[in-house]
Regions:
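Conserved acidic carboxylate
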Residues: 17
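Two-component/phosphorelay signaling modules centered on CheY-like receiver
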Residues: 20-40
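Acidic, metal-coordinating helix/loop segments flanking the phosphotransfer/catalytic sites
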Residues: 41-61
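Acidic catalytic/metal-coordinating carboxylates
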Residues: 44, 72-75
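Active-site residues of response regulator receiver
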Residues: 65-66
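Short amphipathic alpha-helix used as the core "switch/output" element in two-component signaling
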Residues: 74-85
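Alpha4 helix (beta4-alpha4-beta5 surface) of REC/receiver domains from two-component response regulators
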Residues: 96-113, 117
Length: 142
């Protein structure tokens, strides 16, 4: 609980990332720097779609890599288009070309970050998403 007696819940997150090394480093960093709790990990587009379906309104943040073992992160962004207003979808990629950023944003990504140079901005966005999720009623679509 915070000083006002409000329960501070971590940001329930679905992580779509096929690299074990990146996951091993990213998960503890997200927990420490942005109060993120990873509730599901997906290495493929089909695993991510199952996680989105399983958790429905109960996730707050989807962190999506674009190039997966099988399938594309763009598929996940399409599936997130009807997400609730409290839910955020961000792309964390090694290929943040201007064209790829444009495509991701057109598909409804809230933001696109370069894994190699924009992690500080990514963590700031996670903190902002956590604040918004706590203040946004669940069950309303974007």
């Amino acid at each position: 609980m915070d000083a006002k007696g409000v329960w501070e819940m971590p940001l329930s997150t679905i992580l779509v990332e096929d690299s074990p090394t990146i996951r091993e480093n990213l998960i503890p960093a997200m927990a420490e720097l942005a109060d993120v709790q990873v509730i599901a990990i997906a290495e493929t587009a089909s695993e991510a779609l199952l996680a989105l379906e399983k958790y429905g309104e109960d996730w707050d943040l989807a962190v999506v890599d674009l190039f997966l073992k099988s399938g594309s992160g763009l598929t996940i962004l399409r599936a997130c288009q009807t997400r609730g207003s409290h839910q955020h979808a961000v792309v964390l990629t090694n290929y943040p070309t201007s064209e790829m950023r444009r495509r991701c944003l057109e598909l409804g990504a809230d933001a696109v970050f370069d894994k190699s140079s924009e992690l500080d901005a990514f963590f700031e966005h996670c903190n902002s998403a956590r604040t918004q999720a706590r203040n946004q009623p669940r069950g309303t679509e974007r």
